[in-house]
Structure formats: C-alpha cells, structure tokens
Amino acid sequence: MDKKIVIPGDLLSDDVKKSGYGTYVKNDKIYSSLCGIESLKEDKVGVIPLAGAYIPSVNDVVIGVVIVVTPSNWILDIAAPYDGLLHVSEYPRRVESREMPEILDVGDSVILRVRDVDSSMKIELALRDPNLHKLRTGQIVEVEPVKVPRVIGHGGSMISMLKKETNCSIFVGQNGRIWIDGKDEDIELLSKALRKIEAEAQRSGLTDRIYNFLKNERMKEKESKPVEFLKNEKTDVSVAKEDHSEDIYRKIDVLLDPKN
C-alpha cells in the first residue's frame, strides 16, 4: 500500500506529544507544515518533504565541485543555497598557494565533510580524513537531497542491493550527489535505477521493486546479445555457478525489507 501524501494544513494526529519534523501544533492537534509523505512511528508523527534544497549540517559528508580557486581557499558548489569553503589548512598536507590549482582545480569533484555552519550560512568544509578525497574516475548522478534516504534504504538495504546487482562502486553524498563507477553498461543500468528510485521514492516496497527492475533489465540485455556471444558466454559459465547465483538472489530477496 502506498504511503499517504499530505499538504500543509492536513490533520495528522491529536496527540501533540508526537509532533515531529514537518509538523506544527494548533488547538491540541498536529498538522502538516510541508508537502510530503506522512511518516508514522510509535512515538512520532512527521512529514518527509517531497522536494527541497540541501541544507548542510555539521559532519555531513557531501560531494562538492570546485568553482573557484583563491590563494588560500577552494570554493565549492555543494548543491546547497550557499557555496562551501575549503581552507588550505583543511587539506591533509601543507600546500603552497601556487600548488592549489594542481591539487584541486575548477571542475574537480571531491568528497568532503561539512566542518562548520554558522548563523549566516557560512559553510566550512574539511578534507582531513582518509575517506575524503578527490574523485578521479566514475561519474556523478544527482537526485533530490530528500530522496537520499531512499537510495540508502533501511539499514543500507537498497544501496547494498544496488552494489551487488550492478557490480558498481557507489558513494552517496548527503547533498544528493551520488558517485558511481564501474563498466559503462553497469553505470548506465545503475543510473536508470537511481532515476527510478527518485521518481518512485514515495512508493512502498521500493527495494523489491528496484531489485526486480534490475533483474528484468539484465534479462533484456542478455536477450539482445548476438548469438555468437551467448555461445561463448555459455561455455564459460557452469551450472554450479548459475545455481549459486540464483541462491544469492533468493537470500537477498528474503533479507530485503518489503516495506522499505
């Protein structure tokens, strides 16, 4: 069953203690303050917005794109209303001003952490972590920031399944930018899946839906291959391997949360 879409002013509950994100209380009742999906939990009633800009929070890990290089800072577009600032002191090693364009130049994509956000929305970024680095391969796909939780899935169920079924590396930035890398055909398939997740984020059973979509696309791809290629492929794949693959698919199907 699909989740309920609400608009500002819709009545959500008469238990004011459960008021959560995207709601307001009036006359001892909880109402929606956003256009989004109703989120009902045991102790909270909230609204997940259907759309909206990324609002940075401290310690968010995001993907930024360098837009300006100054003598002491890199300025990056982080898909927020305000740009982010990476000071040279936040780079992992000492950097001279003349080196800065050689290290990170305009157009480069980088995984960074939001170090600080002040009241005037000055956003400071950091790169002092082994997991934070410049992206040299792959490509970036952008989705609405509010859809990021659906790309990750409950307990990481969606992203784990995407990695397994597409054979791609994936990193999801909290600002809605997603880095993907792999073979060209796998990247194309994953991009389609991400667009489908974004378009159907409000639907229930999304992980299973995307899993079936990927299997169907793989089947279409296999059927469209030349006969000669299929013959070669058949000699390389034993029955045991095929059975093992199907067993993995069944295990994934059982582990996935059908309501996620």
From Swiss-Prot:
<feature type="domain" description="KH">
    <location>
        <begin position="136"/>
        <end position="194"/>
    </location>
</feature>
<dbReference type="GO" id="GO:0005737">
    <property type="term" value="C:cytoplasm"/>
</dbReference>
<dbReference type="InterPro" id="IPR023474">
    <property type="entry name" value="Rrp4"/>
</dbReference>
<dbReference type="GO" id="GO:0000467">
    <property type="term" value="P:exonucleolytic trimming to generate mature 3'-end of 5.8S rRNA from tricistronic rRNA transcript (SSU-rRNA, 5.8S rRNA, LSU-rRNA)"/>
</dbReference>
<dbReference type="InterPro" id="IPR012340">
    <property type="entry name" value="NA-bd_OB-fold"/>
</dbReference>
<dbReference type="InterPro" id="IPR054371">
    <property type="entry name" value="RRP4_N"/>
</dbReference>
<keyword id="KW-0694">RNA-binding</keyword>
<dbReference type="InterPro" id="IPR026699">
    <property type="entry name" value="Exosome_RNA_bind1/RRP40/RRP4"/>
</dbReference>
<dbReference type="Pfam" id="PF00575">
    <property type="entry name" value="S1"/>
</dbReference>
<dbReference type="InterPro" id="IPR048565">
    <property type="entry name" value="RRP4_S1"/>
</dbReference>
<dbReference type="Pfam" id="PF22625">
    <property type="entry name" value="ECR1_N_2"/>
</dbReference>
<protein>
    <recommendedName>
        <fullName>Exosome complex component Rrp4</fullName>
    </recommendedName>
</protein>
<dbReference type="InterPro" id="IPR004088">
    <property type="entry name" value="KH_dom_type_1"/>
</dbReference>
<dbReference type="GO" id="GO:0000178">
    <property type="term" value="C:exosome (RNase complex)"/>
</dbReference>
<keyword id="KW-0963">Cytoplasm</keyword>
<feature type="domain" description="S1 motif">
    <location>
        <begin position="59"/>
        <end position="128"/>
    </location>
</feature>
<dbReference type="GO" id="GO:0071034">
    <property type="term" value="P:CUT catabolic process"/>
</dbReference>
<dbReference type="GO" id="GO:0071051">
    <property type="term" value="P:poly(A)-dependent snoRNA 3'-end processing"/>
</dbReference>
<comment type="function">
    <text>Non-catalytic component of the exosome, which is a complex involved in RNA degradation. Increases the RNA binding and the efficiency of RNA degradation. Confers strong poly(A) specificity to the exosome.</text>
</comment>
<dbReference type="Pfam" id="PF15985">
    <property type="entry name" value="KH_6"/>
</dbReference>
<dbReference type="InterPro" id="IPR003029">
    <property type="entry name" value="S1_domain"/>
</dbReference>
<keyword id="KW-0271">Exosome</keyword>
<dbReference type="GO" id="GO:0034475">
    <property type="term" value="P:U4 snRNA 3'-end processing"/>
</dbReference>
<comment type="subunit">
    <text>Component of the archaeal exosome complex. Forms a trimer of Rrp4 and/or Csl4 subunits. The trimer associates with a hexameric ring-like arrangement composed of 3 Rrp41-Rrp42 heterodimers.</text>
</comment>
<comment type="similarity">
    <text>Belongs to the RRP4 family.</text>
</comment>
<dbReference type="GO" id="GO:0008143">
    <property type="term" value="F:poly(A) binding"/>
</dbReference>
<dbReference type="GO" id="GO:0006401">
    <property type="term" value="P:RNA catabolic process"/>
</dbReference>
<dbReference type="InterPro" id="IPR036612">
    <property type="entry name" value="KH_dom_type_1_sf"/>
</dbReference>
<dbReference type="InterPro" id="IPR004087">
    <property type="entry name" value="KH_dom"/>
</dbReference>
